[in-house]
Amino acid sequence: MKQWLKDAVFYEIYPQSFYDTNGDGIGDLQGIIAKLDYIRNLGCNALWINPCFDSPFKDAGYDVRDYKKIAPRYGTNEDAAALFRAAHEKGIRVLFDLVPGHTSEEHPWFKASCKPGHNEYSDRFIWTDSCFASGDGMPFIGGETERNGTYILNFFKCQPALNYGYGKINQKWQKPTDDPACVATVEAMKDVMRFWLDMGCDGFRVDMASSLVKNDTKNKKYTCKIWRNIRDMLDVEYPEAALIAEWNGPRMSLKNGFDMDFYLNWQGNGYNWLMRHYDGAMDSNPHNIGKAYFCKNSGTGIDKFLDDYLPAYKATHKDGLWCFITCNHDTIRPSAGLTTDELRLAYATIFTLPGAPFVYYGDEIGMRYLPLPTKEGGYFRTGSRTPMQWDDTANHGFSTADAQNIYLPVDTAADAPTVAAQADDPDSLLNSVKSLLAFRHAHADLNADAPFKVLYAPKAKDDYRPFVWQRGDLICAVNPAGVSIELPLELAEDLKIQYTIGKAEIVNDMLSLGAQSFAILG
């Protein structure tokens, strides 16, 4: 494992919504540079920046038109280089978002691929051999190009799939992964990675990392082979570069080239039971049914989380990091279902479990999900992509543009959380996050790869549903319920309480936890 990942805490930035420095209503790279001190003081020493490459923005930048050009609305390539330099001066690493599975339909590669005559890019994308042919089970578009064929899509209509080949060949137009055209696609993506790494980028979050090869085996044999090939290149040329997969499959990703994978919010999985448990994960107006572990009155035990988490953790913890998120640009903000006190306990827990935690911009102040009309292909996700709320000035300090010209509306509620309002409040969520991350950085026992052991995780019985775990020589304990409890643990005599949220004390060698409390002993 790269040494810098052991103490890494990431901050995810949706660039168009973070901070606008030129008054056009859209956040920019200079805005990120301007807020680096805030990010560092929060306790984050690494960034994941959502797509910032040139794009028509039909899917918020996940439809790339030019992999080697910063989108003009965010700035220039020179701004990207300046961001890398400024971040590194402050001890902050920067990961860009890489979209290797598809491009925009406006990408020059795709425009060339649409031509009827054979050229360098004819097989850069997946085409059938007839304008009347279906996609063999994959979504496809036909009748829009000079070329006699239909092309395969990865997601939206605007995102033609790049050709990495097929694991199982069903049609004569499908190519094996070792076909020269498919190998050329891999090499082209390596070239993109080299371009940004040479400029100072520290690695990539990889979009839809498991989806490269079509008709792959159940264990993604051929896609995994591609990522091992890319990792071999990185290990030789950029040994400190990190890769994190959008996969939620650590048994595959961490053993095949990735340093990290996300523990994503999938309906009914362990993370979902821990933090969310919405009634309909894709609902544009989500209804939390109060069953998440951290909901005070849920009655849900920690076993719902551990039954899913522990087998995968035990199978992969020596290979890399399976990382917790507070939220991301694709999910409903956690404040939609958890109160501030519940968020405090949730953050304390995921910040002290294994892996490198990821904080989504604004979650540190409890920004709210806003039910908004879709923007740039966001649909239900749009409400989690609103401008960062810095203060109580116009547009919450995000931009000097007129309100009707900013990227998305800000939260106009009188009690909308802001950085400025919480900065001087010692009891604020913001300062709770700061103190938690400061404690994490000060104790190597909370490093991403430090030993982890479950000490006490009984099945829920009414309001009795604690969770106690060990990281190195530290013991962490949480009580999400609304009643005080005592834990039947034999504690070493020299153990002292080092950190608390709520009330916690050691009485007669027993740990007593107040209602909705968290403690670290050491």
At which residue positions do the language-model features occur?
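Acidic/aromatic-lined carbohydrate-recognition and catalytic surfaces
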Residues: 2-187, 198, 209-256, 388
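Loop/helix patches that line or flank the sugar-binding groove of alpha-linked glycan CAZymes
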Residues: 4-6, 235-237, 249, 254-257, ...
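Short beta-strand segments
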Residues: 12, 48-51, 204-208, 244-246, ...
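Conserved alpha/beta catalytic core and glycan-binding cleft of carbohydrate-active enzymes
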Residues: 105-141, 231-387, 392
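A Trp-anchored, charged/polar loop motif used as the substrate-binding/catalytic surface
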Residues: 181-192, 196, 299-310
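Active-site groove signature of glycoside hydrolases
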Residues: 193-215, 324-328
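Beta-strand-rich binding/interaction modules
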Residues: 484-501
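C-terminal beta-strand-rich structural cap/linker in extracellular carbohydrate-active enzymes
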Residues: 507-522
